[in-house]
């Protein structure tokens, strides 16, 4: 696969998603390929007049019981749109995932891309959920909003195997009911902790109640994104709380701890993303803390 070409087209096509697009380089592409879950098949480059103008990555989820495929990196450089390139890339991706035995295909787009929405609907994709990019100014973080003060927070120790295994177990338990979640292996969890593709400064925290570990969250700083956007922003990662312990202020406690951690690192803002079909209603938690929606994305699904 021609990684330099892939990087060039991605950067040219994704500039419209400036709220989250940080750019990518060849070295980062190679790091992404080291992930145990990376699928090396299904990557296609579209050319017009021998010039690369578009991409698509037809990813077959290895651990999905539903045999679900995803259309990733589906993009065309703006000046080459409306010339049939997106239609051809979509056709190639769908056929690739059919060939690999997938029963369901998902693809996403920004709300402002009415042309992409129309294309997906013409291909019998149906809207299944929205994703929200949310942001908060760290000078406005509240307190006494229902956080559980009996919860003890402790950091994950990256060099302790037991902590990695605890995180893996918690992640799979907490996210079992979340749509699109596929169980993580120990290797995938270890790789995300030790070799995250862009959060070079990352911390993960466990929440314990009555000496039992019941939840976790993570925070990180993407230095490349901050330089590109000229901001001082951190990110709240996944927040997971075991089902029997939800609605007890533990998630609120974890979010507030994460925000205070980022503020202590001199960040001014924090970002998080979540979906409207999350059964834990995480978006309500973030709104309670003070996050505001920056941008929305639409995920469509096609059953084969």
Regions found by a protein language model. Name each.
Residues 1-8, 152-169:
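A short beta-loop-alpha structural element at the N-terminal edge
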Residues 10-14, 19-48, 55-61, 181-209, ...:
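Active-site rim helix/loop that mediates acceptor-substrate recognition in acyltransferases
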Residues 43-45, 51-60, 70, 75, ...:
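Conserved beta-strand in the GNAT
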Residues 61-71, 81, 223-236, 246, ...:
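A conserved beta-turn-beta hairpin within the catalytic core of GNAT-like acetyltransferases
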Residues 62, 77-151, 296-303:
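Acyl-donor-binding surface of acyltransferase catalytic domains
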Residues 76, 82-95, 122, 238-241, ...:
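Conserved acetyl-CoA-binding loop-helix of GNAT-fold acetyltransferases
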Residues 123-142, 256-260, 265-304:
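Active-site/acyl-donor-binding loops of N-acyltransferases
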Residues 178-179, 208, 215-217, 225-230, ...:
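Extended hydrophobic-aromatic, low-complexity segments
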